[in-house]
């Protein structure tokens, strides 16, 4: 189990297995605890200074948790989109409710749209209420401009060309096989802020 959510940990603990990796549920305290080899992942998540010192992508960290070596493998998406590329550029502006501070301000998105003008076709984020529609929309974009969000990870799995906008999260943790990362020009002491 590679998820720290207590309910997911409790569910995975109920599965009969001879070897476990990742996290387990502590019923006495109601929190996630680490199995052997996973303690450093909790430290990355809980301690900002440790997080800054860790210079690995999450893929590499997760592979290590299960005793394997990451060799640049990308994500596998269990969904096969049916859409064709329709738009030159997709603007993935919404980050969801969990981390609103990851969002690039809307006025910047509008300014970027004006700068691009009519040179390329632009599509604004679609499928906000339906994950299948969201996959299809991402697949319909040739280049994907996105905040650090679920859409970024889906676009990576779909092998899209990506321009990723980072703010409060640590860009070095995210593996983007085909794209670039844009970071704040100033090095803020708080980054990573999440």
Residue ranges, per PLM feature:
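Catalytic machinery of carbohydrate-active enzymes
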Residues: 1-194
């Amino acid at each position: 189990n590679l998820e720290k959510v207590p309910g997911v940990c409790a569910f995975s603990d109920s599965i009969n297995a001879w070897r476990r990796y990742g996290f387990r549920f502590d019923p006495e305290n109601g929190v996630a605890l680490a199995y052997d080899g996973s303690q450093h992942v909790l430290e990355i998540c809980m301690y900002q200074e440790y997080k800054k010192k860790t210079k690995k992508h999450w893929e590499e960290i997760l592979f290590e948790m299960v005793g394997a070596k990451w060799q640049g493998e990308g994500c596998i998406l269990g969904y096969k989109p049916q859409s064709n590329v329709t738009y030159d550029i997709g603007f993935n502006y919404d980050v969801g409710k969990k981390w609103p501070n990851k969002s690039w301000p809307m006025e910047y998105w509008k300014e970027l749209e004006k700068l691009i003008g009519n040179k390329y076709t632009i599509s604004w984020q679609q499928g906000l209420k339906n994950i299948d529609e969201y996959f299809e929309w991402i697949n319909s974009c040739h280049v994907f401009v996105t905040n650090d969000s679920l859409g970024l990870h889906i676009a990576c799995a779909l092998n899209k060309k990506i321009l990723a906008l980072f703010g409060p999260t640590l860009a070095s943790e995210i593996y983007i096989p085909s794209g670039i990362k844009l970071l704040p020009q100033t090095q803020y002491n708080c980054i990573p802020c999440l």
